[in-house]
Amino acid sequence: MDSAWVQQLPPELQNDIKAVVEKDQSSFAAFDNLHAFLTGGTTKKRKLNAEPEEIPPETIIFEINEISFYSPVRKRMNLTLHLVEEDGNPSPALSIVNPSNNIPELTFTGLDQAVKLCLLLPILGNTTNTQKKAICYLCFWMHDENMSKDPIVCQMNLDLVKKSMIKNGKLPADIESKFITPRDALPLNPIQERIIDYFKRQFQLCGISMMNYMPCVSIFRNTFSLNDDNAIAMNTDGASQPALVMVNCHKGAKEGVLILLQANKTNPAHIIFGFKKPILVFEASQVLHTSYSNITRQTFSLNVVVLNKKQEQRELEFGMIDEKFYKVIDDFIKLQGINDATFNQEESGDDSIEIVHVNNNDDDDDEEDDDFQSEDSGSDVEEEYNSDLNEPLAAHEEDGVFERGIEIE
């Protein structure tokens, strides 16, 4: 056990490895393989704080300039797809880049393996407003929690992206004259659709499958089956059932959005709670059963019991949901084949299964286990500022804040 990497470990870890290897000499091969994977694997996150270098312009594949990030950093940055050298070969990378010096603050490589979920999402309240309908969220969740526990979440205005693309020569200057769109049209206009299609194709070339849930009636055939200030149901690719449901709700005292995603060719069905900390993300297959409670004439609660990676059952309550949206939520649950335990609980009066109840009080952000992790101090702020310019972001970009992303496995 004379490998150089072992000698670089703290004495306590060296002793632990030595004790295991003394019992089974063959076990060192597993340690050695683990070290090789962690130091040379394809799923990497690089914090460039030693000698950060500017991204050479000729290596940039695609860039979205100066958009508002809420996670894992909180300021205006560039989102850049570019090429880096790995093992002597060019490989696509995704970086969050400081626009003042074009130096990445965070870089992911091996994108086909690194990115688990990439979503373009509408924002509740904006879809019914013709002035804000083009403002959306772009989100990335990573496979390896050791590499990134925070999702990449940014908010962008497709109209501002259009102006930037015209300025950079990605779109013709006279593109506005090629299309006529009524001012009060709620679906996106043809130019915005083409921008999204361009995003999707560029990400796909780099190994990222972006799922678009914005209303695009021509290219993507995405249409609203429900469009309310407090709820959205989106049918994609001309399907008869919604692929996306978003509903305002509360988890304890915290207001947020419950997001239900149907399975597609790329991803399994997911349930997400955002956008304030902590963000919950889990696959629908992890749900053991659901039930409804606190039912009144106007609102109800959805209780979801999931199995985490410790094989513990966790009960999550999403409350204060408008009764108007019961059917669209219940239809999603039935399509997933999830058992509705509402009547079983009423008849039994108590649970025969031991369930870990998640604290729904205001201090539930302080929970520290595999599913809920505490935030860094100072991250929960009311207004985001550009750290370089010390200016508040535009008012239309302050609709909601994404915080730490927690996945239940």
Curated annotation (Swiss-Prot):
Residues 361-386 have a biased composition (Acidic residues). GO terms for molecular function: DNA binding; histone binding; nucleosome binding. CDD domains: PH2-like_Rtt106 (cd13304). Pfam families: PH_18 (PF18469), Rttp106-like_middle (PF08512). Residues 344-409 are annotated as: Disordered. Keywords: Chaperone, Chromosome, DNA-binding, Nucleus, Transcription, Transcription regulation. It is found in: Nucleus; Chromosome. InterPro entries: PH-like_dom_sf, RTT106/SPT16-like_middle_dom, RTT106/SSRP1_HistChap/FACT, Rtt106_PH. It comes from the Eukaryota. GO terms for cellular component: chromosome; nucleus. Residues 394-409 have a biased composition (Basic and acidic residues). The keyword Transcription applies. SUPFAM superfamilies: PH domain-like. Belongs to the RTT106 family. Interacts with histones H3 and H4. Histones H3 and H4 chaperone involved in the nucleosome formation and heterochromatin silencing. Required for the deposition of H3K56ac-carrying H3-H4 complex onto newly-replicated DNA. Plays a role in the transcriptional regulation of the cell-cycle dependent histone genes by creating a repressive structure at the core histone gene promoter. This is Histone chaperone RTT106. It comes from Candida albicans (strain SC5314 / ATCC MYA-2876) (Yeast). The lineage of its organism: Eukaryota, Fungi, Dikarya, Ascomycota, Saccharomycotina.
